[in-house]
Amino acid sequence: MAMPEFTLRQLLEAGVHFGHHTRRWNPRMAPFIFGVRNQVHILDLQQTVPLLDRSLRAIRDVVAGGGRVLFVGTKRAAAEYVAESAQRCGQYYVNHRWLGGMLTNWKTITGSIKRLRQIDEMLAGDTTGLTKKEVLDITRDREKLERALGGIKDMGGLPDILFIIDTNKEKLAVEEANKLGIPVVAVLDSNSDPSGVTYPIPGNDDAIRAITMYCDLVASAVLDGISAEMIASGRDLGAAEELAPEILPEPEAEQATA
């Protein structure tokens, strides 16, 4: 594996440079704005390129050191891609709703995850002693917990870095990460507040093509970090038990399924 590559042209084609209408801007984003076109702020891709590369390397280095990455994106345009990308690289995600205390009150969240596991075991076992209504109520509880916690139920502890799409919507996630000293990588549109973001990526946070590109690049950086960690520890990639074959590099995936 190698660090993911991208070009300024690819960013342009994905619409990364398009900000919001000038009325909706956040003055703190002024240093990252190139100009105005048709009353829309244009983000400076000459800054985005090195900042995106820096962010990807930060994520890669965290993973290479054995760290966990939490993908966060609950807006409709991002939710699906956030989950898919995190799963593809064996990491974790929140794509439904950020619950208050998801990081700062991890002990309580762990209790809810335990409850989810208990329900899974209950429904997988013999339910003949329960009424249809009881089974239905339990199933609804499970669905609610799965939506909220399904992406972090196997995380096993606090993440080591966050990747966030839309810091306005995920303001609480940024605040909780800041309180705990967890670094934040985030896409910042022209209406975003860069405060509390360790690794800013100036770019459109609404266009599906742009969101898909960010998620794919971050997932690839994670996979490169996993490869680096395994090489450093002298392990054979093909013998890794924790990763699904589809997220291993092709030669190793073939060995894992052979």
Swiss-Prot record:
Similarity comment: Belongs to the universal ribosomal protein uS2 family.
InterPro entries associated with the record: Ribosomal_uS2 (IPR001865), Ribosomal_uS2_bac/mit/plastid (IPR005706), Ribosomal_uS2_CS (IPR018130), Ribosomal_uS2_flav_dom_sf (IPR023591)
Keywords on record: Ribonucleoprotein, Ribosomal protein
Short name of any one Pfam family annotated for the protein: Ribosomal_S2
GO CC, any one term: cytosolic small ribosomal subunit
Name recorded for this polypeptide: Small ribosomal subunit protein uS2
Ribonucleoprotein among keywords: yes
UniProt record, GO biological process: translation
MF-aspect GO terms: structural constituent of ribosome
Tagged with keyword Ribonucleoprotein: yes
Database matches in Gene3D superfamilies: Glucose-6-phosphate isomerase like protein, domain 1, Helix hairpin bin
Transmembrane segments: none
